Curated annotation (Swiss-Prot):
GO biological process, one term: bacteriocin immunity
Protein name: Colicin-B immunity protein
Lineage, highest ranks first: Bacteria, Pseudomonadati, Pseudomonadota, Gammaproteobacteria, Enterobacterales
Regions crossing the membrane: 14-32, 104-121, 149-168
InterPro entries in alphabetical order: Colicin_im
Assigned GO CC terms: plasma membrane
Cellular compartments annotated: Cell inner membrane
Amino acid sequence: MTSNKDKNKKANEILYAFSIIGIIPLMAILILRINDPYSQVLYYLYNKVAFLPSITSLHDPVMTTLMSNYNKTAPVMGILVFLCTYKTREIIKPVTRKLVVQSCFWGPVFYAILIYITLFYNLELTTAGGFFKLLSHNVITLFILYCSIYFTVLTMTYAILLMPLLVIKYFKGRQ
């Protein structure tokens, strides 16, 4: 019989694999942009999604619009990770009832804010605050930003879906 740590390790490996698979299209957009800034493929895709709300940079509107709109698929990938791992995830550390209640309240609140900003909000990085303005001038830093957003949304979606199951396991274990 496998231990809870082994089960969680396997679930984490699946999460990492899905994260890497999910970032491959972002790398493809970056490589296309670096090799051919006026790529017909990029401009064709850009024209298809330009009307959607996105986090963009005026220094590279085509690449950033495509990456931002691709990031809208992160919740779907989070759902797939959840469906592949929900049976194997276990609670390892002892948790208090207070922590469970706080997680059940603040987790969805934070997730709703994150989803609104990343999926439904128009944001121009060159006019944003100092840190984001700095990132908006270089395609590599923009790529890192969009990979970070993708991974954050994927992980948060997975965590929000997993939370009710862990709460049920928590209360069953206390009986």
